[in-house]
Structure formats: C-alpha cells, structure tokens
C-alpha cells in the first residue's frame, strides 16, 4: 500500500493528535541521527527529540513519539489509527481497541445517513453510527471504546419490551471514518478491513464480532463455537481472518429459516481451547460457558489483559 493515503489522512481536519508538523520540507540540519531505514523511507531523531519520517531524503511528517521495533516503526495518528513504516512501505494499521469497536458494529450495528426535507425546500442530513444489544455489558463496552477512540459518548435508548439497548453516535466525521473503511453497507452487510489489521487487530475484530453474532453452546463436556450472519461475503472474509491467525474453520453452511437464509461456520473441536485463549468473547454468557468448558476439560482458566 502506498504512502499517499496515509499522509492525506494525517492532514484531515477530522483527525486529532496529528503530527507536530506535516507537509514536505528539506531535511533539517538539526537532525541528530538516523534511527532506522526501510528502503526509500527513513526515520531520524531531531535535536528536539522529535521523530522525522522521510521519503527519499525529504521530510513528510514529524511526530513527537514513535514505537521502534526491529522490523517496523509505529507512529500514533488519532482515532485508533497507527502509521506503520516497514520494508513494505507505509500503511495505516487499526489499533486493537478500534478493531474491537469495528467488530461490534459489523455484527450488530449500522452506519448510515438520512436526509429530511424541511420547510422552504431545504434539507437536513443526520449521520449516525449505531450498535444494538440486549447485553448491558456490550453496550457499555461500545460506549467505552467510542469515548476512548473518538472522544464521544453515545446516546442510549432502552426498549423495555425486549430489553434492547440502542447506542447511537450522531457524528458526521465518525460516519465518514467508518465509511472509508467500508465496515457497513446495506442491511446486514459488513466487511472486514483486513488490509488495515495486524494480528492483534485481527484477533480484536473477531472477538468484537463474535461477541455480537457468535454462538457457543455446551452439551456435557463438549462445546460448539459458531459464527452466524445473513451476509455470506462478509462471513467468508471473517473466516479468512481466522485462517490468517492459524485456525482451520469449517466451510460455510447455509440454513433456510422463516426469516430468510442464514450462513454459518464453526471452529473445529481441536481448536476450541486455542480460540478461547487467543480470541474469547465479551458476551457474559459466552464467557461463562468458556470457563465451564475449560474447568471440565482440566485447563486452567486464564485472565486476559483486556479483562475478559
């Protein structure tokens, strides 16, 4: 992936916490030394302690902080986006926190706009990003991630007859941010931003999605782990992500139900413990079944860093 898109995103007014300076300029004399070089890209540290990102010797961005690894350098942009510089060039990577949020929305959310005609022929456009759940814990997770990534607290609407909680963010910038990533399309459609996810991001996205549209059942000392969706293309993308992570999910099956066609695939029994330990779920019912299964199978119940 080329560097143009990443640099343009740095410049977008919607982003906050952007680099100290952007735009091309000649290499400053105050540069103290080269930190690392990947092909035509290099990272230098200046006398002010800032990190300069260069392409062919020209500074294209200045950052106050950098995470330097042997095979990559990471710069935090904003709203859950990291700029990754490596031998492959530069590309935008989504943080695990944002990947979790996107997984929740892909499973049980929407991202849309609505135009309403007003008096005298004018129009009003409402932009909204929504998440639907009857689990208070998942609604709270959606709120926490929204606040952490975008700095916005969603509105919550409770439907008493079935305890459905609708969490809504009314924000044009967030709508376009998610539209750029092609997370949601028409009804029931979703896509996985696979090109913007590293392994940690892939695990987080799958966990967010599974918490919404996943199912785990237990019978005796055996469990079944399944992913469901009415949108086969998105489900196949999710299946490919699990393959990227070293899983061997079964092929997608089709079920005809009174409400329409539903697609699903399952995780092989021999990979259940791997799934629980590496992916898991935020849904309380899933967590209880996973813990019961591990105890019955003689495995120690691990406490994950994210609290699940």
Name every feature range the model reports, one short phrase each.
Residues 2-308:
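Internal intein/HINT superfamily modules and their associated LAGLIDADG
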């Amino acid at each position: 992936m080329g560097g143009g898109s990443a640099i343009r995103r740095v410049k977008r007014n919607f982003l906050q916490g952007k680099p100290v300076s952007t735009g091309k300029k000649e290499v400053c004399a105050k540069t103290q030394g080269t930190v690392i070089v990947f092909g035509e890209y290099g990272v230098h540290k200046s006398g002010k302690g800032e990190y300069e990102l260069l392409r062919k010797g020209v500074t294209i961005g200045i950052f106050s902080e950098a995470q330097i690894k042997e095979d990559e350098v990471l710069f935090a942009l904003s709203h859950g986006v990291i700029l990754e510089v490596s031998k492959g060039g530069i590309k935008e990577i989504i943080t695990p926190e944002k990947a979790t949020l996107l997984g929740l929305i892909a499973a049980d959310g929407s991202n849309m706009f609505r135009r309403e005609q007003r008096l005298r022929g004018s129009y009003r456009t409402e932009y909204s990003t929504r998440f639907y759940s009857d689990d208070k814990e998942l609604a709270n997770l959606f709120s926490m991630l929204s606040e952490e990534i975008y700095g916005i607290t969603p509105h919550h609407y409770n439907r008493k007859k079935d305890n459905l909680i609708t969490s809504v963010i009314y924000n044009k910038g967030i709508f376009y941010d998610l539209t750029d990533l092609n997370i949601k399309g028409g009804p029931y459609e979703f896509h996985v931003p696979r090109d913007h996810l590293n392994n940690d991001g892939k695990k987080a996205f799958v966990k967010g999605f599974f918490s919404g549209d996943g199912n785990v059942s237990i019978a005796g000392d055996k469990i079944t782990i399944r992913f469901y969706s009415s949108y086969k293309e998105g489900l196949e993308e999710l299946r490919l992500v699990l393959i990227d992570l070293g899983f061997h999910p079964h092929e997608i099956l089709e079920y005809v139900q009174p409400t329409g066609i539903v697609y699903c695939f399952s995780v092989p029994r021999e990979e259940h413990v791997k799934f629980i330990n590496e992916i898991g779920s935020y849904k309380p019912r899933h967590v209880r079944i996973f813990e019961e299964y591990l105890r019955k199978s003689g495995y120690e119940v691990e406490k994950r860093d994210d609290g699940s």
